[in-house]
Amino acid sequence: MVVDGEVVLDDADNLALDQLDVANPEEWEQGYGYHITGRVTSAIEYNRGNTETDKLNLDAETILESLRDRITLRADYEDSSALVPDTDDDGNPKQDAEGNTIKTSQPTADNWRVEGKYDYFLSDPRNYLGLNVGFRSNVFADIDQRSYATAYFGRKLLTRETLTLDAELGVAYVDTDFVVTEDDSYTGATINLTAEAQLFDSRVTLYFRQANIINTSSTEKSIYRTKLGLRFPLFLGLEAAAEASADYDGGAAEGKEKLDETLKFRIGYTW
């Protein structure tokens, strides 16, 4: 029974409503096991006509969280190609026996990224220590493989049911194997922000992720990654998303663009 903002208990001290953290807690909230969430989404494009392209993008994330620690796994993959006329030595389009232009598929994007994070909550569960290891490849950016490892201190700045914000500050080591350009490695500082807001009675989720690796020996070669999007639940665990991202690589290979900007519309499954 609730009377004047207090829970009245038989043969026990009364409790103010703000003293009740969790009603009907799940097992993980009592210290048993993990609370597992995640999603897998894809964006597929198939164009035929004046523009003939094929694009595939896959993105996956899963988070296992307990009262003691949190494990985050992320991966994404992008592949795209375009059909272009096959030409002879004089630059003229080749044709088949029926007079149709012969076209060949040429790749225009081929990149992937995997990342794993481990966070250990301290005595104040809003604070945590963490390790982050990641690998990526982008052949068209001349990156055969880039690996990085970071150690950081993090804090949950906001932990409301409808608004969360985590901030992390740490150190990193980055090693890049280029396809053509001379390989590079450096140590740096990391500043990361992760936020989510539930809008319109949790019918829409606004999410934001900012990951920065500051090259302490040459700041103009730093890496900045920003992602902002909206997720909309559909039915039976399906969801749609609209997402904008900007990746700035100050240490890009010579002749390659430092800034990649994308706008994606996704559909996927969440659990």
What are these regions (language model features)?
Residues 1-47, 52-53, 57-61, 113:
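Compositionally biased alpha-helical segments
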Residues 16-23, 30, 76-192:
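Outer-membrane pore/translocation modules
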Residues 40-42, 73-75, 129-133, 151, ...:
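Membrane-embedded beta-strand positions of outer-membrane beta-barrel proteins
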Residues 44-48, 77-81, 133-139, 155, ...:
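Transmembrane beta-strands of outer-membrane beta-barrel pores
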Residues 46-55, 65-67, 106-109, 137-145, ...:
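Solvent-exposed loop/turn segments connecting transmembrane beta-strands
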Residues 61-65, 117-121, 134, 154-156, ...:
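Transmembrane beta-barrel domains of outer membrane proteins
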Residues 67-73, 124-129, 160-165, 198-206, ...:
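Repeated loop/turn-to-beta-strand initiation elements of outer-membrane beta-barrel proteins
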Residues 259-271:
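Outer-membrane beta-barrel "beta-signal"
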